[in-house]
Each structure stands twice: as C-alpha cells, then as structure tokens.
Amino acid sequence: MAQEAPRWLEPSPFEWKDQTGLAVKTAIPGAKPTVAIDVASVTKSYGDKPVINGLSFTVAAGECFGLLGPNGAGKSTITRMILGMTTPGTGEITVLGVPVPSRARLARMRIGVVPQFDNLDLEFTVRENLLVFGRYFRMSTREIEAVIPSLLEFARLENKADARVSDLSGGMKRRLTLARALINDPQLLILDEPTTGLDPHARHLIWERLRSLLARGKTILLTTHIMEEAERLCDRLCVLEAGHKIAEGRPHMLIDEKIGCQVIEIYGGDPHELSALVSPHARHIEVSGETVFCYASDPEQVRVQLDGRAGVRFLQRPPNLEDVFLRLTGRELKD
C-alpha cells in the first residue's frame, strides 16, 4: 500500500476573490487566477531618505519569484513590509488574500521564513528545535511529532534527530532551518539568501529541495546575490536599485532582451588597448578591473583579433543572469 504524502507536502489551498469580493479557496494551484503577494505603489522612507519608491509587483501562487539588487536596493525593507514587520509609507500590500500589516498576524500563520543567518537553538537537538518552533504556530506536541519524521527526511537529517545543532555542519544547519520553516505547512516561503556561504554540494542539495517544494505547489519569494541560484529557481524576478524596479520578467527573457549575444571575457593585457582592439566587432563593451567584457554577435571576428597576442587570454560563453544584473546595476562596488 502506498504511503500517504505528508500533510505539509500536499498542495496547499489558495484564496482568490470572485467578482462579489468574497474569498474563495481552491486546492488546485492554477484552477483560478491566484496571487500570493500583491505589492501596489508602495513607498517607504526613513526620515528624509526614501528607500522604496513606488514599487509594484505581484507573485503568483505556486511560482518562485526573485528579488535581486545590490546592497541597499531595498530588498530587506520590502521583505519586512511583506511580513508586516515594517509599515509602508504609502501603497498597499496583500499577502495570501489578507491586507498587511493590518492582518499580518493571520498572514504569518501561513508563511515560512528562512532568514539570511541561521537562528537555531544551538544547544537543543534537531528534534527539539522543531518541537519548540512548532509551538509558535499553536501546534500541539502530537501534531508536531507527526510531521517531524517527514521534515527530517526532506532535510536528509534522519540520522541527526538527536544531535545537537552545534555539532551540525553549515549545510545541515541550513537544511534544518528550511525544514523548520515548513513546520506549519506554509503556503508561502520567504527565503533570504538561502545558500550564501554553503559549498557547492550543499547548495545544489538545497536547490533540489526547493524545486521539490515548487513541484508541490508552494510559493517562494527569494532574495539572493547568487545569480545562478536565481536563474535556476525563479519563474520570474524583479531587479531593484535604490528602491526602484528597474527590470522584471522571466530570467531567460531578460537575458535575451538585455544581452542577446555571446560574451567574451578578455584579460592578460591592457584593458583599454584590448577594448579599442575589439570594439569594431562588439555590440557593447564593459571593463571591470583588468577584465574586458565584450558582447559580440559575431565572436569569431573578436577571436581573430585576439589570437596570437602574447599574454592575452579569453573565454567565450553564453550570456547569463549575472551579465544582466551587472548591465543594469553597474560593475562598481556598492556598499
């Protein structure tokens, strides 16, 4: 007999509003137009410093939506407003069908959060961390214990249930933080830099786990500085700079729209001389330190100019989301 899927892995019911304005629930993502997050013309200032400027975007139920931007772009501020922890100056935010911040407590009961830095109880065991966290959602001990085995299996921590968190590796702690965020069977997951600082093996395991959640109908709001992560996971994304939305769309569409040609990275010589050498055959050129980024529709012509030059090395590759990000926000360091 097939084992029944754990409750927290089943597609969650989503709310939508019909023409009468009444809230209606559907357990089938996509059966009706659904919106998990609606941010409409939101502003926020601290003193006389604006940090969010008329920002609008929607996150459809069941999709992974990315928020990208350099430090200080407003990602943390808008995330805090979505959670009801910060009040917008103007504009409206609706999360899972309820207005925020006025009914943020209700919305948060259906949200799981993975913060940028793990805030686990280090002296507790893995199991104890899950037990304690579940009580914040008014779950009984019996309810929590019923889902712990599935959560540990999901996080691949079945053999670490009684281990102290302080003895876990960084990747294990991150997986436990993700499992903990699922304790309340959330409809929406908010992930802040979920794989920063992890080695490639741990990062890819987290990505695989997140894709399995999306396949189950969960909604994910993701902030990250890892462009490969955003390109792999996000259905759509929004790029912020100084509180403004400067681009929005599907990753591959943004790559085609903003770049749309091969990229050749050139280094090992004077960047200004190299730029002048290849510029007749380039659609666009950027210089960062000692590296020249040449965007070319006909890379063969660029290679002809570079072949045989002493000390000069180059790498031709397809464009990626990092190229888009740096094209939009610039290659200068932003603190």
UniProtKB/Swiss-Prot annotation:
Keyword NAD: no
Location(s), subcellular: Cell inner membrane
Ranges where the ABC transporter domain occurs: 37-267
Chief location of this protein within or outside the cell: membrane
Matching SMART domains: AAA
Positions of disulphide bridges: none
Binding site for ATP: 69-76
One GO cellular component, as annotated: plasma membrane
Record keywords: ATP-binding, Cell inner membrane, Cell membrane, Membrane, Nodulation, Nucleotide-binding, Plasmid, Translocase, Transport
InterPro entries: AAA+_ATPase, ABC_transporter-like_ATP-bd, ABC_transporter-like_CS, ABC_transporter_ATP-binding, ABC_transptNodI, P-loop_NTPase
Membrane topology: Peripheral membrane protein
Enzyme Commission number: 7.6.2.-
SUPFAM superfamilies per the UniProt record, alphabetical: P-loop containing nucleoside triphosphate hydrolases
PROSITE patterns, A to Z: ABC_TRANSPORTER_1, ABC_TRANSPORTER_2, NODI
MF terms in GO: ATP binding; ATP hydrolysis activity; transmembrane transporter activity
Stated family: Belongs to the ABC transporter superfamily. Lipooligosaccharide exporter (TC 3.A.1.102) family.
Subunit note: The complex is composed of two ATP-binding proteins (NodI) and two transmembrane proteins (NodJ).
Function of the protein: Part of the ABC transporter complex NodIJ involved in the export of the nodulation factors (Nod factors), the bacterial signal molecules that induce symbiosis and subsequent nodulation induction. Nod factors are LCO (lipo-chitin oligosaccharide), a modified beta-1,4-linked N-acetylglucosamine oligosaccharide. This subunit is responsible for energy coupling to the transport system.
Protein name (database record): Nod factor export ATP-binding protein I
UniProt source species: Rhizobium meliloti (strain 1021)
